[in-house]
Amino acid sequence: MMVEKKKTTTKKTETKKQDTKKEAPVKQEVKKQAPAPAAKAVAAPGTTTKQEARIGVFICHCGTNIAGSMDIPAVQEYAKTLPNVAYVDNYKYMCSMPGQAVISKAVKDNHLTGVVVSACSPRLHEPTFRTATKEAGINPFRFEMANIREQNSWVHMHDREGSTEKAKDAIRIAVAKAALLQDLFPKTVPVEKAAMVVGAGVAGMQAALDLAAAGIKTYLVESDTSIGGRMSQLDKTFPTLDCSQCILTPKMVDVGRATMIDLMTYTEVDAVEGYIGNFDVTVRKKARGVLTPAEAEARGIVGGGCNGCGDCEAVCPVIKPNEFEVGMKPRKAIYINHPQVVPLLYTIDFNTCIKCGLCVTACGPEKKAIDLESKDEFVKVKVGTVILATGYDIFPIENKQEWGYKRYDNVITSLEFERLICASGPTGGHLVRPSDGETPMRVAFVLCAGSRDNTGIGKPYCSRFCCMYSLKHAHQITEKIPGCIPYIFYMDIRSFGKAYEEFYYRIQDEGAKFIRGRVANILEDPKTKNLHVYADDTLLDRPVDMEVDLVVLAAAIQPKVDTNRTRKLFGVSCSQDGWLLEAHPKLNPCGTTTAGVFLAGVCQGPKDIPDTVAQAEGAASAASIPIHKGEVELEPYFATCIEEKCAGCGMCVNLCPYSALSLVEKDGRQVMQVTEAKCKGCGTCGGFCPGGAIWMNHFATPQIVAQIDAFLLGGEQ
């Protein structure tokens, strides 16, 4: 019935396709002649001998995902008419074991030289079908995939006839390329038996410990003066209310003691070269001004170096806000973040140090730990794999001016609340109003402060853990301040984790008041410094004007300020919001599109501590596989230079984003040479080459031209 409908159509495009089908035998004859020069050109850069193409086409139903939107039998009959097609079949689930068996049997029985599978996205199942092709006895790179699901049936599910015709086009294009595909062979490169973890928060520490436990030398690079990250600033963790430092400090100590971990604090990645298995990373160890015992010993100072006694800090006359305490407590120009730092090593802030020399005198002639003339040091390390665990920053909530942060003293962020309520914080764990030091008895928590914000000022995404830590804060004030009432202004309470919903019920039972509605404005009473919170209660459908003593903003989180620079160094993509982009959100959440580079923690997107640690362990496991194997295979999608055409202009060398190209002297002239292990097959060089001297393996110019012809000319030459 589908064929009859097509015969009666009056559309020009439909008539064109029908005419193409009628002339199939003629096309077959022309096609046999046409590939001769193309095959010769493709084979020029070291591929296999030309042979007559015998292509097998396999059409997947994908249940009803594909078959429900198009006429599979009509598509199958059309595929039989295409030049070079020797076999056509269809199956309900081609990716299943029986489906792959269909491919294998057909290849062997019909002596096929290439395979085209018409199914879903190659991003999902290309490796599956490539393996099936290889097991059937064909070079796996003689496989081509036609996407007739994501790019067809799913978007044309209500246009059965149009979807059917589009599937025919997709298969015709894929067959045209498959007829010209050549044997390609992966390259094997050795892997350096070391790894690097960038960022030493809880994710980076866990990843480094797992790698070290697997016997892998690990360089742990942290830009701050000590390890621990954001978790070291927290008082308690939800929903178990464990002391954050109590569960984090042992892990920090383990990192400091691990012989297989080279801990590099106050250090940043400066440059990256190389590829999976052979990354050459240059790190910049910032001038610290204080010697470690090992550094002192290397200078001949026996028994010297910093021991964390604090004598230097006591005499330092320079005072500035302490970043670890979110500016609510002072620190000196020579300082440590907190008493439990790892490594226990003071740091001089040379931006504020006046070099008075008092710290040198206080340190004494025995330790000689102070070096006021120290300079930045650049160190090169070679590693096989890399894990990025760079963490996050707090969204500058002062940008949302309606909430009065940094205008009103008694409007604070959740991180400031954490330090105020923490026993090691600036107030010794006593929650007080910044304006007058009084204990607040009515506290408003504003959730989604900057999150789920489509105004263009805040962030459109959910920061995931704000709801839960605000519930934790509500518990802490009811526990520490009898009679204090927490008011929680929320949009939705997202208690998604294990025991989170139960924790939510517990906070309700403890007396917290919940008002569903976004806070529109906060104003201060200039006399009392109390705050009026204005919102709409969407459950009771009435406006709210609530006077409170303190407002806590659950500020959104965002990628760290240097995330963009770091990701570019390692060739990692990012999302629209700046979070590092995983290779696949479901199937490869720890990997990236750059082989050998993995992600862990919040740098990939907002997540709580359990999810962060779990991803860190997954990233460590993935990063250890190439190292333990000792070598890796690189897919042969490399640029290839046709030296007879190369003019040695060097344009491609300057354009290559991966530094994979160079000019070399050959037969008295310069020609382009590819470092195949660095090449990602992006095609930039080939697109810009003025002489057409660069082709991409598996995407050679004749193959692309054949696809274009198949689409525009219906396969006619």
Label the model's feature ranges.
Residues 1-8, 12-717:
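Residues forming the flavin
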